[in-house]
Amino acid sequence: MIQGERLWQRLMELGEVGKQPSGGVTRLSFTAEERRAKDLVASYMREAGLFVYEDAAGNLIGRKEGTNPDATVVLVGSHLDSVYNGGCFDGPLGVLAGVEVVQTMNEHGVVTHHPIEVVAFTDEEGARFRFGMIGSRAMAGTLPPEALECRDAEGISLAEAMKQAGLDPDRLPQAARKPGTVKAYVELHIEQGRVLEETGLPVGIVTGIAGLIWVKFTIEGKAEHAGATPMSLRRDPMAAAAQIIIVIEEEARRTGTTVGTVGQLHVYPGGINVIPERVEFVLDLRDLKAEVRDQVWKAIAVRAETIAKERNVRVTTERLQEMPPVLCSDEVKRAAEAACQKLGYPSFWLPSGAAHDSVQLAPICPIGMIFVRSQDGVSHSPAEWSTKEDCAAGAEVLYHTVWQLAQGE
């Protein structure tokens, strides 16, 4: 029923907003590029017959009324902001597919018991202020006050950026939804991995979203001359760091479900001919089960301490962030499964290793996600790509999922 060509044209048009010479997209929160994106999507929402407004957090919302004005609302959406030099599907697909769903309903005279709201959440990525999911946290009523003091590379705080965008940070609590007012939240998103591609399927149903911990390691040794210091006398924190990173890989692999990554490492003083004095790196550890993730972390910590003693270096750790795993709602999963069956797609289940706005909304409503196949599993890159056909398939599954949720009492 949905018009895949219309969805695709909108994706491509939106992808021009913030486009870089590399072909990637940079569209940070509370910038002129984000404003242009919001205005463009707002025009799509109005074309779809929605009542359009922004809440106190800057979340862009388009509402389709239901037959019962007192019924709880079904939310569908994602985000419009990007990472630096990212792709044009991560976030926008979920928002524009939501618009396509309600526009198709309106064009075919489909009415629902529950109202439906399409939401484009503010600052999911956190690329500008290094604190993400601002809009969804605000809607859930869980945005900590200290987040307003986070600053970008230019020294501008989140509070200042909101004011520059015409928002009042003091009104942020007004964005919070009251308990019991949201029936469910459904998000269509690119997978950002290779599982669907490996299985040859265009869409999949998400079982849950992995919980993560970020742990900063600081390893201190002794800076000495690289040529004049015998190997037997060295207190080399870089060698210890390398050994610990291998331990992380080994312990994560033992479970079959945990993933551990070190994507950031700093070496001091950083001379070619100097044994480092200090090495810092951050561990990203994720699993769908918190107890499994925590067991892996304990094993890593014990082995890291052993390595420190063997190499005569000092290891300290600091937990930077923790996010609990979130399981998707049985009701939303059943609706998505029925949608797949209706459309002739297998019900393929997979977890999400990446965090999404869904995580923040889980405390206030049932949540669910549908994934669309990612070419080569690439995301957060100009090479991010999903085909027109796969995007349309995901939107069709989303349509029938939302319809079923919005029809029920």
UniProtKB/Swiss-Prot annotation:
It catalyses: an N-carbamoyl-L-alpha-amino acid + H2O + 2 H(+) = an L-alpha-amino acid + NH4(+) + CO2; N-carbamoyl-L-methionine + H2O + 2 H(+) = L-methionine + NH4(+) + CO2. Homodimer. It comes from Geobacillus stearothermophilus. The keyword DNA-binding does not apply. Keywords: Cobalt, Hydrolase, Iron, Manganese, Metal-binding, Nickel. This is N-carbamoyl-L-amino acid amidohydrolase. A divalent metal cation 2 binds at D90, E125, H380. Belongs to the peptidase M20 family. Requires divalent metal cations for activity. Binds 2 divalent metal cations per subunit. Residues 208-325 are annotated as: Involved in dimerization. GO terms for molecular function: cobalt ion binding; hydrolase activity, acting on carbon-nitrogen (but not peptide) bonds, in linear amidines; identical protein binding; manganese ion binding; N-carbamoyl-L-amino-acid hydrolase activity. Its cofactor is Mn(2+); Ni(2+); Co(2+); Fe(2+).
